[in-house]
Amino acid sequence: MFVRIAAGAVAGIDAVTVSVEVNVAAAGQLGLFLVGLPDNAVKESEQRIRSAFENTGLRMTGKKLVVNLAPADLRKEGAGFDLPIAVGILAATEQVPAEALDGTLKPVRGILPMAVKAREEGLRRLIVPCDNACEAAVVEGVEVIGAASLGETVEYLRGDRTIAPAAASAAFAEEEGGYAEDFADVKGQAAVKRALEIAAAGGHNVLMIGAPGSGKTMLARRLPSILPPLTLDEALETTKIHSVAGKIGAHRGLLAERPFRAPHHLSSQVALIGGGQSPRPGEVSLAHNGILFLDELPEFGRNVLEVLRQPLEERRITVSRARYSVEYPANFTLVAAMNPCPCGYYNHPTRECTCPPGAVHRYLGRISGPLMDRIDLHIEVTPVSIQEMASAERGEPSAAIRRRVVRAHEVQRNRFRGVAGVYTNAMMTGRMVREYCPIDAEARTLLERAMERLSLSARAYDRILKVARTIADLAGDERIGTAPIAEAIGYRSLDRESWGR
């Protein structure tokens, strides 16, 4: 008897349909034969399935079983094929009308893109491990059945057990509950808050430079609280990435808050961009639609920082290896923080820098010029005074800042309506900058003078215009005057030749 079961495999952050074809041969060597480019984990499924059958009172046939995993040119990895192979064997041996060794079904990564693919293929029902049921149920149009064990699956297929479909409304689609960290708790730092508001409004990359204890990390961790809420499409895409990476816990809802990823400065290149023997998304993709925070930026390896150049420019990352090439989305806002020098107190208002001559310049030199050019806002963070710390007055709450940011985002979405892949000012191409960033003669003269005095690159010229466009959007102005240009130039601190000398 021949049976075909529909299963799925992950490719990047999407899924592909894998047909599990089981045939009971009338003659030939007894046993189970797996074909179709399985890896070692898939080949070992025979022993796991045999053990599960024995512990659930099921039987393997005493004939030759050939299991083909199609398409043959796609490498099949992991233990996620155990259930469809087992169900295929049961159907082929007429024991039903599809992992632990006791038959328990364990959760697998990437179930959300598999559910999306099942809907695209016209499948109406999906049987998954019960810990994955809430994750898969967010996909409308597919009935998701969560089974706890192989035995429970068999009983359901035989009609001996009823399992209610998983519901996304109560178990998955959670409302955003607000952020515990609020800008209202930050004393002083009005200039830095203003710069972070601009960054949030236009999707601009940020570098904060200041002494230890000046509040750089505290400010960065509050940035997600002023970002616009995730749209449904963004939430689904973000959740797919975390699903493929195995970061979605049991009974977790659709990710409703923008990601905030803060990898350690000892992180490897693979940890940052993704890859590995079985490819998984890295930190730049896990931060998609959110914030990638790199604290102590110069302490990261030079080769690690240089791989950021592609995702910062293209909003995606391509991981190529000998056996595969996958592409992951990586549309994040980079927020970096660093001390101004090795001792940390260069330009400090009260403490003296103890670094030898030239040390500050060499320290900043750990960050390459091309990477620095891709950072729109350079923010100097100074320590808060004792008077500001002792003040009982609270700062402006994140909710108020967020309302201004959301309005600016709406202006940008209307501006770029119909332009594929562009919805913030930071995403504009050079041609779009010329079209959407008109400046008057006085503002142009100011910008040209700054370019000459600061020896700025052509990329920095465009980034100043993008930031100025965002400043004008926050003010509700269509044209860009001298004030937005002057403020945007002020955020190019590290471009000044005098810095660090």
Where are these regions (language model features)?
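Walker A/P-loop
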Residues: 208-249, 314
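Basic, amphipathic alpha-helical bundle interface domains used for macromolecular binding and assembly
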Residues: 35, 41-46, 61, 68-78, ...
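Walker B catalytic acidic pair
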Residues: 289, 295-296, 307
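Peripheral, non-AAA+ core regions of ATP-driven protein-machinery
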Residues: 1-207, 211-214, 320, 460-461, ...
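P-loop NTPase nucleotide-binding/switch module
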Residues: 161-198, 202, 229-284
